[in-house]
A protein has these predicted regions:
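N-terminal single-pass transmembrane signal-anchor helix
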Residues: 1-13
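Conserved functional hotspots that engage anionic ligands or polymers and/or phospholipid headgroups
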Residues: 11-13, 21-35, 39-145
Length: 145
């Protein structure tokens, strides 16, 4: 009888330990995905700020980033560009906004907010590498490149 009780307690302890281990693993992967999402968003803002819209006659709409280890992929979409009176400016003054991006242009009346971008960033795990725990995090933010 005592052997049954001890084996039952041991079985419950092992089951709890495996559940706890899986929880730590899931939490670690989710934190890694969130950190990669944040760094990818910063990289996208850097790409947007350095992109010459007049030279290319368009604007950046989509930026895709894959983690170096291949575990995660991030899709970043620029949904709106907020421009003072709907016009673009650079060092030499007012420049035309590319006509191919007119659907992304949102005219605003505050010069202080000129150039802000509404970004949607989605991070997902690579389904071939992490099959057990699907991760998908969506973030929308208003950023200033």
């Amino acid at each position: 009888m005592i052997v049954l009780i001890v084996s039952g307690i041991a079985l419950l302890t092992l089951k709890y330990a495996s559940i706890q281990s899986r929880h730590y693993s899931d939490s670690y992967l989710k934190e890694q995905a969130e950190l990669f999402l944040l760094s990818s968003t910063e990289a996208a803002l850097l790409a947007i700020s350095g992109y010459d819209r007049q030279k290319h006659n368009n604007c950046l709409r989509q930026i895709n980033v894959i983690s170096p280890d291949g575990r995660f992929k991030v899709n970043i979409t620029a949904e709106k560009y907020f421009l003072f009176h709907g016009k673009d400016y650079n060092e030499s003054g007012e420049v035309p906004w590319p006509s191919s991006c007119s659907d992304l242009n949102e005219s605003i009346g505050r010069k202080e907010s000129h150039g802000m971008v509404l970004i949607k960033a989605v991070v997902e795990n690579n389904s071939t590498m992490l099959k057990d725990n699907p991760i998908r995090i969506v973030r929308r933010s208003l950023q200033w490149p």
